[in-house]
């Protein structure tokens, strides 16, 4: 109706020759056509104007902004400056709002320059828009600079800067701003408090979020639905069910139940705290279920691997007139992949196509990531290849997962290729990709590359710090790891339980007993983190390996958690190193109850008994293994030469170049003996002569792989070998000699430890 009326009026103006007579008339016409007819026609009217004043220029810029054509709007704004026309404050504020996305950041900086040239920095609305524009582009220091330059600040100014801090993760600084704001005589409103609640929620800091809520209530403000939703997000993690239920009670008492967003967030909270029955109850009680509510429950059921229930819910969903979207299907596909059923997950992709829902990069990444979580890396890589065949380009999440997989497989060469891809596609700026690169290089035995990437990250997340600390731990670089942790604390980053696992691993792998105790106590006293089994295992391993077996025993007896197989395994390993049979047999008995089929425990006892020449006990353990049908883990090592991975097995399949390898190895050992090498025959757990033991030592897979690397890898390229079990002390010694005699760096990886040999020394300083 209004469109027809507008066209009629404009037609009448044209008939009377008044359509171009007054710029106010033309400007109004441009506004009408831009809103109701066609942006192109509005621009045509502007182009045909014989004379343009400030009103016309500002109107055409606003017309393009309202229509979403921000690039044209910015172009017109530049032309406007050359014409001498003056931009209205409202036009520039709107332009700055549009330039808040990353694509428009450069234009936003130019508009800021225009503001400064015209002396408009006293305009509060303009400055508020500048604060928001800079913060949304991650430029917090520039946001603060604008805020500090403001002579007059209103409540919106304070909310803008406070929101900048919370959205970029600096919530504690935002609390400081809140205090400063109150000192200046301004009373925080609901927007202020919701910004703080949202900031704490995004970091999962439930206690801090609740403290803010209490402070808000003391100030006389009642929480809004947005406040409650943020609070629910903050407690949406395992262990916080009690808090979540308390908030649910508050919602009921204060009649906030009617809000769909609150109800949906409640469902999500119950799912993430692991209480699906309550999530279903909330869902069933909803009067109006939107697509988000359905997707939340389907996602929760899929995550819990209740896939039949998830599919049944999707059928019910369609019956109630809501069509499953890509998010719904992606949840189901991820569930099947996580359950170890990639074929079923790919079937979901087929069903999506049948239903007219186009699978996207998120769909494929969901399956890819699901296989990865399940530890099924081979299937994950197959899915990635299939994704490429379908013509779906990977995004940052895909590449992060791929890098994680390559790190777990120690495929450094492939990891470098993916790194190159990320550079070409400009994905390296993504925080998750950068962190995944640090993780991949650390786990693949290239610590230097991990360090270079890590220190190049501008806004380091807690996850990136944790990855870097674990990298130092893997290499036994204790002093550097502790120094990095100190820098992290100085930067204001608050450590979590994972951080302390990394820090204690740094201490454990470097034999730093005093530092280990210091950080274990600090974790509890300053940060209120309750020690987990992982933390306790690190302490037992640290104390035991350092020779403090009695202290390790006392620690086990007094720890608040019940010792599990991880604890007793670490203790048994320490007893084996220091040949303490009495304590070893106590640990062994506990392990027989906890994990009677773990071959590693049997092998540690065989190792200890053989070193004490108790051959009858060795045979007794071997018989026990046979009776319990415990199979010794296959032993192998591998090395990549060019594009080919060469695997060396302890038994069974031989390498085609075995003759050349043994010839070179015997030659090397002869040279080593002249330099002082004495074979450590205690690594062979058989009652045979030393000469026979020495021959068996030559067949250790890591030695064959290292020797093959020396033969095939010319120049000074490092020799990188991965072994699936712990290396023996003799192989460790041989690697040190090889690094000197052949002037080569050798990187030998065994599980979560990496030994970097250079000039006859190892990065672990023989603490392993």
From Swiss-Prot:
> What is an annotated GO biological process for this record, any one?
RNA modification
Q: Name one Pfam family in it.
A: E_motif
Instruction: Determine if Transit peptide is one of this entry's keywords.
Output: yes
The transit peptide extends across 1-25
Q: In the record, what terms sit under GO molecular function? A: RNA binding; zinc ion binding
The PPR repeat boundaries are: 22-52, 53-87, 88-122, 123-153, 154-188, 189-223, 224-254, 259-289, 290-324, 325-359, 360-394, 395-429, 430-460, 461-495, 496-526, 532-562
In this chain, the stretch annotated as Type DYW motif covers 674-768
User: Which protein is depicted?
Assistant: Pentatricopeptide repeat-containing protein At4g01030, mitochondrial
